[in-house]
């Protein structure tokens, strides 16, 4: 379960994190291009699976809403940070009838087959119990998409910076991701490298 420090950190910095998605050219100049690469990767999985219902877990300000709504997909976005939820609801108003935003954390996800795809971008970075999160997502949807930072210098620097504020940061190698899938009742369908930023992973629920 995320700590109170986690919720506070992202609540206090909601505007800053939202700003990362305002301009792709600027983001790429600042070395944040993978933020847009992983958005496109998630949308691609939604298209390939012909999904109609998507859970956007840790939706932040809602950068995934517009591209999914453009496909006619119904999106449920959840986030524990009140300021993020406020921004996400503002974005959801641009897509009436297609996007719903709920103020809750991943530990409350207990729906079964309520969605076709569950997405968590920029979430596994901070989760101390990733198998629990992936397992819940795999119950809620057959297909799961998640981003995972690589354990390089960038992650080490984030670990120091965020750790000073009580927020844990984790890094993953492909072997870690494979073990995580096995422990969560999932299989790895595809791993897409995101350069130094890590990986975007498409999981599928393992056959019973």
Question: For each predicted feature, which ranges?
Answer:
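Short, glycine-/aromatic-enriched active-site segment of Class I SAM-dependent methyltransferases
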Residues: 150-168
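A short, conserved alpha-helix within the catalytic core of class I
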Residues: 127-137
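A conserved beta-strand element that flanks and buttresses the S-adenosyl-L-methionine
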Residues: 119
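Conserved beta-strand signature within the Rossmann-like core of class I S-adenosyl-L-methionine
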Residues: 141-149
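Class I SAM-dependent methyltransferase SAM/SAH-binding core
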Residues: 61-99, 104-107
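Conserved class I S-adenosyl-L-methionine
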Residues: 1-48, 51-58
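Short alpha-helix
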Residues: 168-184
């Amino acid at each position: 379960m995320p700590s109170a420090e986690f919720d506070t950190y992202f609540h206090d910095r909601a505007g800053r994190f939202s700003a990362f998605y305002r301009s792709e050219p600027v983001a790429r100049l600042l070395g944040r291009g993978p933020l847009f690469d992983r958005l496109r990767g998630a949308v691609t999985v939604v298209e390939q699976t012909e999904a109609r219902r998507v859970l956007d877990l840790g939706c932040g300000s809602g950068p995934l809403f517009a591209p999914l709504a453009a496909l006619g997909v119904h999106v449920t976005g959840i986030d524990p940070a009140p300021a993020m939820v406020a921004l996400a609801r503002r974005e959801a108003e641009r897509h009436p009838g297609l996007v719903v935003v709920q103020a809750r954390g991943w530990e409350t996800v207990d729906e079964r087959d309520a969605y076709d795809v569950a997405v968590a971008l920029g979430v596994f970075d901070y989760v101390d119990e990733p198998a629990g999160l992936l397992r819940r997502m795999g119950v809620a949807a057959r297909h799961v998409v998640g981003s995972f930072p690589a354990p390089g210098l960038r992650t080490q620097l984030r670990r120091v910076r965020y750790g000073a504020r009580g927020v844990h940061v984790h890094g993953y190698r492909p072997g870690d991701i494979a073990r995580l899938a096995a422990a969560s009742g999932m299989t790895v369908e595809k791993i897409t490298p995101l350069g130094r930023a890590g990986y975007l992973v498409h999981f599928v629920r393992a056959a019973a």
